[in-house]
Each structure stands twice: as structure tokens, then as C-alpha cells.
Amino acid sequence: MLVIPAIDLYRKKVVRMVKGKKENTIFYEKDPIELVEKLVEEGFSLIHVVDLSRAIEESDENLPVLEKLSSYADHIQIGGGIRILEYAKKLLGMGFRRQIVSSKVLEDPSFLKKLKEIGVNPVFSLDTREGKVAFKGWLDEKDIDPVFLVNRLKEFGLEEIVHTEIEKDGTLKEHDFSLTERIALETGVKVIAAGGISSERSLEEALEVHRRTNGLLKGVIVGRAFLEGTLTVEVMKRYACQENNSVS
């Protein structure tokens, strides 16, 4: 099972936005480059990096940070405001093949195929709030069944998603794996769970779901709990070493 540390960028700083709300932004005195470098040295095969400035404000202010992070592109899945092919190509040119997409895919599912055609490995970000699908930096919602949506996107080549529980994101409350597990079992796509992966108990439950789904629950993303030390690197590594922890 993959255990994936998360780093959100806003105004060139490492942040967490509780429940995805800009007014609830927590800034951390951590250098994102040094943080990624340390995580790679610790042996994490994948790190989740999201450019919130671009996702929410369509700003390129974090681009200099991303350019520096490109040295570790093989260890990073990048997301945030990837809505046009030109920007996806720019990220690909930096070495970021694994790209997280959401809003554009909801508007135009064929965007998944277009990304694959240029060499991107797209992962769909399925962000849910009280059963509804959120998009555009979590500012808008669609009243659509997540399982139906994922099965629909499979027709366009979808193979993997990140499922985030927005109401738990950045709160240190426990993730509810019931919907995550249902999505995995009823669609057959690989799922990475996010939002509320806040304790060793969360990791234990994730590992159980990983086994029940025969590995379809591919892993979990740990954000605030990692940044604040609620989950230590040592504990995260211990769970990452169990079962299959391949990125592909």
C-alpha cells in the first residue's frame, strides 16, 4: 500500500486549507524543496503536490517552485488547475508525467484521452462533499453519484482516481472509507484515499480496505497529520512497506 505525503502550495508557501476553504489556510514554515528532498531520501516513492494558487486563482505564482521540484518529478504526482493541454505539456516538459485532473474532465471527459496521447499519466481527482462531486477548486458542486461518474469516465480511459473527502480534509478527523471502498469495488479502478488520513488508526483501516479490495485501494494521502507530526515519517514508512507499494 502506498502512503503518500501531501504538500499543498499557495503563494509559494506550504499550506493546508481546512475543508478546502481559503479563509481557513494554515501556513507552515517549511521549505517545499527541502521537504520533498527529505521525503525522497526517506524512501517515499510518491509525493502528492498541489498548486492551490493555480487551482483557485489561476495564478502561476508557484511556477518557480515547481521548476525547482522538477528535479524530483519521478517521485511527484502534480495537481492544481490543469485545465488546458498547453499547461499539461508545460508540466510534462518539466518531467511531471503523473498529473491530477478534475474540473476539465468533468466538462470534457475526452481530455483524459488527449492527455494520454501527449504522454501524460492522468489521475482523476474525485472530490466529494456530503455525497456530491466538487470541482473548480472545490468551489462548485455537481449532484451526481460518484460511482456512476467514475464508470462513465472509464469509457474515456480512466484507470485511477484520488478520492478526497472534503469535509475531512485538513481537519485531522478520520476518513470514512465506506464510499472509497464502494467506488473501488463497483468500478474496478485503482483508488487513492485522501482527506482525514490523520492517525495510525486511519492507516490500519486503509490497509484492511486495501486487502478487501485486492489492492484496488492503492494507497492513502497524508497531509496535515504529516506536516504537524500527528503521523510520523517512521509510522508512515512502516505501513508503506506492507503489501504492494508500486506506483504504477
Swiss-Prot record:
Swiss-Prot/TrEMBL keywords: Amino-acid biosynthesis, Cytoplasm, Histidine biosynthesis, Isomerase
Localization terms from the record: Cytoplasm
EC number: 5.3.1.16
Major location (coarse): cytoplasm
Record-annotated active site: 8, 127
InterPro entries from the UniProt entry: Aldolase_TIM (IPR013785), His_biosynth (IPR006062), Isoase_HisA-like (IPR044524), Isoase_HisA-like_bact (IPR023016), RibuloseP-bd_barrel (IPR011060)
Class of the enzyme per the UniProt entry, highest EC level: isomerase
GO cellular component, one term: cytoplasm
Biological processes per GO annotation: L-histidine biosynthetic process; L-tryptophan biosynthetic process
Reactions this protein catalyses: 1-(5-phospho-beta-D-ribosyl)-5-[(5-phospho-beta-D-ribosylamino)methylideneamino]imidazole-4-carboxamide = 5-[(5-phospho-1-deoxy-D-ribulos-1-ylimino)methylamino]-1-(5-phospho-beta-D-ribosyl)imidazole-4-carboxamide
Protein's pathway: Amino-acid biosynthesis; L-histidine biosynthesis; L-histidine from 5-phospho-alpha-D-ribose 1-diphosphate: step 4/9
Transmembrane portions of the chain: none
Keyword Amino-acid biosynthesis: yes
A GO MF term: 1-(5-phosphoribosyl)-5-[(5-phosphoribosylamino)methylideneamino]imidazole-4-carboxamide isomerase activity
Protein family according to the UniProt entry: Belongs to the HisA/HisF family.
NCBIfam families in UniProt: PRK14114.1
Name of the featured protein: 1-(5-phosphoribosyl)-5-[(5-phosphoribosylamino)methylideneamino] imidazole-4-carboxamide isomerase
Species of the source: Thermotoga neapolitana (strain ATCC 49049 / DSM 4359 / NBRC 107923 / NS-E)
